[in-house]
Amino acid sequence: MARKKVQRKLDGWKSKEWYNIEAPAYLNRVIVGTTMAGDPSLLVGRNVETTVGELTNDMTKNNTKVILRVNNVVGDIATTDLMGHELTTDYVRSIVKRQTSRIDANVDVRTKDGFVIRVKPTCFTIKRARSSQMQAIREMMVDIVKKRASETDFETFMQEAILGRLSAAIYRQAKFIYPLRRVEIRKTQVEAMPAAAPAAPAAA
């Protein structure tokens, strides 16, 4: 009986194929991992986690997780959509200092091409700020993020959010309300895609 169970497991593995998981074209189609499946359609909808460090070959950026979702399988390539990013908990903790203020915001924005994204920017001040200053900075963060999303398409907005250009834009303006030590886009999450958004084609 035990031999039959082992044989069935071996036969199951033999019937499965390996698939490369590929990042979207605007993330340079980097292969972020491999997986096995007996039926490639079962891969569609599966979330895959990687890091900016792996996507850019810069290990100093491993504190930023990137979430991809398989949208199609062509041959042995599973293509993906970018679904968001998040800073690691350890990294965020390392930024927090005593006698300073942390200012969080949570805002849903719509890009020029119709993607709805939840964005969570965070400011860290040099010293402890007053509640009125914190509120003013929070409102400015929300305004900047909304405006930038409305001006750009999904790919541009997400690249700016993940690679630091959006946080730099917030820093440049909000520092005049109260001195800031750092600004981060702590998390993004795709809430809705436009109905006409096509699945990414596999690389030739």
UniProtKB/Swiss-Prot annotation:
Q: Which domain of life is it from?
A: Archaea
Task: Supply the alphabetized keyword list.
Answer: Ribonucleoprotein, Ribosomal protein
Its GO biological process terms? translation
Q: Name one GO cellular component term.
A: ribonucleoprotein complex
> Could you tell me which InterPro entries the record lists for this protein?
Ribosomal_eS1 (IPR001593), Ribosomal_eS1_arc (IPR030838), Ribosomal_eS1_CS (IPR018281)
UniProt-listed PROSITE patterns: RIBOSOMAL_S3AE
Any one Gene Ontology MF annotation carried by this entry is: structural constituent of ribosome
Q: What would be one Pfam family of this protein?
A: Ribosomal_S3Ae
Q: Which residues cross the membrane?
A: none
Q: Which PANTHER family match?
A: 40S RIBOSOMAL PROTEIN S3A
Query: Which family does the similarity line name?
Result: Belongs to the eukaryotic ribosomal protein eS1 family.
The name under which this protein is listed is Small ribosomal subunit protein eS1
What organism is the protein native to? Methanosarcina mazei (strain ATCC BAA-159 / DSM 3647 / Goe1 / Go1 / JCM 11833 / OCM 88) (Methanosarcina frisia)
